[in-house]
Amino acid sequence: MKTIHVSVVTPDGPVYEDDVEMVSVKAKSGELGILPGHIPLVAPLEISAARLKKGGKTQYIAVSGGFLEVRPDNVTILAQAAERAEDIDVLRAKARKSGRTPLQSQQDDIDFKRAELALKRAMNRLSVAEMK
């Protein structure tokens, strides 16, 4: 089966690099499935799981926003943060998830938005960690 090269990169460095059969991500415009030979595309990403299919198995990567760049022979995910399912510290993610009080108090709009994003990232990381 044909493959497409995938690179997942964060400001801290590369997280994943391999050839896969299919990439599935959640963009701001909706779900995208990328196969080898896909037309060029750039799309902003949601906080979600990137699914990388290879050899009948699926690997999951928690992606915290960023951009997807697609070329016919490669896909690059430029993420603000990204973690492979097996690398996620579940206890830390659960601690973040339980920190909902800043959302409830809404003391400051900026604090609320930061807390909301932290909660989304924690919930995404837990979801991806459960998929491994």
Curated annotation (Swiss-Prot):
Protein name as annotated: ATP synthase epsilon chain
Database matches in InterPro entries: ATP_F1_dsu/esu_C_sf, ATP_synth_F1_dsu/esu, ATP_synth_F1_dsu/esu_N, ATP_synth_F1_esu_C, ATPsynth_dsu/esu_N
Subunit composition and interactions: F-type ATPases have 2 components, CF(1) - the catalytic core - and CF(0) - the membrane proton channel. CF(1) has five subunits: alpha(3), beta(3), gamma(1), delta(1), epsilon(1). CF(0) has three main subunits: a, b and c.
Assigned protein family: Belongs to the ATPase epsilon chain family.
Localization in the cell: Cell membrane
Record keyword Kinase present: no
GO molecular function: ATP binding; proton-transporting ATP synthase activity, rotational mechanism
Function: Produces ATP from ADP in the presence of a proton gradient across the membrane.
Membrane-protein topology: Peripheral membrane protein
Gene Ontology CC entries for this record: plasma membrane; proton-transporting ATP synthase complex
Lineage, uppermost ranks: Bacteria, Bacillati, Bacillota, Bacilli, Bacillales
Domain of life: Bacteria
SUPFAM superfamilies assigned to the protein according to its UniProt record, in alphabetical order: Epsilon subunit of F1F0-ATP synthase C-terminal domain, Epsilon subunit of F1F0-ATP synthase N-terminal domain
Gene3D superfamilies assigned: ATP synthase delta/epsilon subunit, C-terminal domain, F0F1 ATP synthase delta/epsilon subunit, N-terminal
Organism: Bacillus sp. (strain PS3)
Keywords annotated in UniProt: ATP synthesis, Cell membrane, CF(1), Hydrogen ion transport, Ion transport, Membrane, Transport
